[in-house]
């Protein structure tokens, strides 16, 4: 790929994430990429909406040089859920049990742009996200703001950057009408 000029967009930028949807990678049967964007996804209700604590989703992406001409890309998705309970144990177990085969995630950023994380044009679905860590704590006092919280980390290393969804699919995700997402009701 040749270097091309890059034009900066003068527009409002909003930090943070608005949504997180996670799928076992085997449940997503087809992903189509057109001009560097996800243009089609097949997998009936493959992605499950994960309702997290407000402002707790954080997606970090980075890359670094490997050897003379290679790069490794890293994705880390952190989120928290407050109040440990039985349903939370079900999520914990599902993420742990699904990690050997891996996950794909849709992260909707603060600008309402959705990204497919755990999939890249180079690796396809061979370098998915896995549960890196989960840890919880009750806190010691009633006044601890971060007490009784469980924190999760999904992460991967792969050979390419996460890809954005095209305008049509992005609109469906934001409207809550994407056929491949099982939304909360």
Question: Which residues does each PLM region occupy?
Answer:
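Solvent-exposed edge beta-strands and adjacent loop segments
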Residues: 2-78, 126-144
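Generic "edge-of-domain/loop-turn" microfeature
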Residues: 27, 38, 84-86, 112, ...
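Oligomerization/assembly interface segments of phage tail-like spikes and tubes
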Residues: 64-89, 145-160
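A general structural signal for short secondary-structure junctions and capping/turn motifs
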Residues: 68-70, 94-97, 107, 142-146
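Composition- and surface-driven signal marking solvent-exposed, interaction-prone regions
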Residues: 92-94, 168-169
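Short, acidic/charged, Gly/Pro-enriched secondary-structure junctions
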Residues: 93-121
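Mixed-charge, glycine-accented linear interaction segment located at domain edges/termini
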Residues: 124-185
